[in-house]
Amino acid sequence: MALDIFDKNDFKEKVTKKSFRKEDIFKDGYFTITDIKQAVKNPNRANIFVNGKYRFSLDIFQLTQLNVKIGAKFSEDEIFNLEQQSEFGKLYALGLNYCLIRPHSEKEVRDYLWKKTLNRKLRNKKTGEFYEKKGVSIVSAEQALQRLIEKGYVDDFKFTKFWVENRNQRKGSSIKKLKSELFSKGVSSEIIEQILSESSRNDGEEIQKIIAKKAKKYTDEKKLVAYLARQGFSYDEIKRAILKEEF
């Protein structure tokens, strides 16, 4: 899900050229921003050229915050920091899009961003040769996660409430299974218990939903009992539900 944040006129205003001489590009050991071009594949970002060559990309908010303009000069350490900001910006955008698909737990988002830190073996479409793409820094991944938490896009309370309210709502799901799923996603037992205590879902109603869906498939009572047990329902709950169906 792309976020269309660029306005062409605004972009031009942010990167308005300043007059500078070519001989000043390397003056005093500083690096000069020689050009800024709106990215083609991702128009929400701008490609930054340093000393005549592409170096990194930033989003429009970063251009303003970091005061990156054509003709601006930066030290080697400052350029390195800008590259780290570039990496952070890309990761934050990826994490944000991931969170907007559906709510995710903190562990899910951390695992998603962690994968970006791993080196990947890719294939060049033109030459067919394989090459290794270096992963992003762990620091940038953690910074992106913390920003998502600060902005409220990652919240285990909200995620757990979403999961309990929507997970197999029509098909039915045992409370035990819901707990197991949430625990596997890194949600603490305290949060799970609190949200479930506030929920109207209960095993009595959930098992009836499942029986209504599966009764035709499992005509043999023993097989139905075994299936319900695998779904996390207790033996007593299963027997009560089946007796209720019989009457």
Task: Locate predicted features.
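An alpha-helical, amphipathic repeat domain used for nucleic-acid recognition
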Residues: M1-F247
